[in-house]
C-alpha cells in the first residue's frame, strides 16, 4: 500500500508557501485547487520533481444523497496536469 506523501506548494518565485499531502500528486493538487489556487506547482518532498497543474474550482449543486446540513451549492475542484519539471537544486 502506498504511503501518503507530502507536496510543497511553490509560488512563481520558487518559495514554498504551503504543504499538501496525498498518495498521488493529483490528490494534493485537488486539495490546493479547493483552497483557490489556480497555478499549482507541487514539489514532492525529498525529490527535485515539480508537478505542474492548472486548477479551478466551480460551484455545483449538492448531490441528491447529501446530508441536510450541507448547503445547496458546494465547491468542486478540478485540475489538469501540464507536466513535470526537474529542479537543479531545491
UniProtKB/Swiss-Prot annotation:
Keyword list (alphabetical) reads: DNA-binding
S-adenosyl-L-methionine among the record's keywords? no
What Pfam families is this protein classified in?
Answer: MC1 (PF05854)
- GO biological processes: DNA protection
- Name the domain of life this protein comes from: Archaea
Q: Which GO terms describe its molecular function?
A: DNA binding
UniProt xrefs under InterPro entries: MC1 (IPR008674), MC1_sf (IPR036620)
Purpose of the protein: Protects DNA against thermal denaturation and modulates transcription.
Give the protein's recorded name: Chromosomal protein MC1c
Amino acid at each position: 500500500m502506498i504511503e501518503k506523501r507530502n507536496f510543497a506548494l511553490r509560488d512563481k518565485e520558487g518559495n514554498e508557501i504551503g504543504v499538501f499531502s496525498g498518495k498521488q500528486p493529483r490528490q494534493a493538487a485537488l486539495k490546493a485547487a479547493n483552497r483557490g489556487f489556480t497555478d499549482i506547482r507541487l514539489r514532492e518532498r525529498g525529490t527535485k520533481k515539480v508537478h505542474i497543474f492548472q486548477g479551478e474550482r466551480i460551484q455545483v449543486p449538492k448531490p441528491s444523497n447529501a446530508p441536510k446540513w450541507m448547503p445547496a451549492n458546494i465547491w468542486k475542484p478540478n485540475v489538469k496536469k501540464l507536466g513535470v519539471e526537474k529542479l537543479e537544486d531545491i
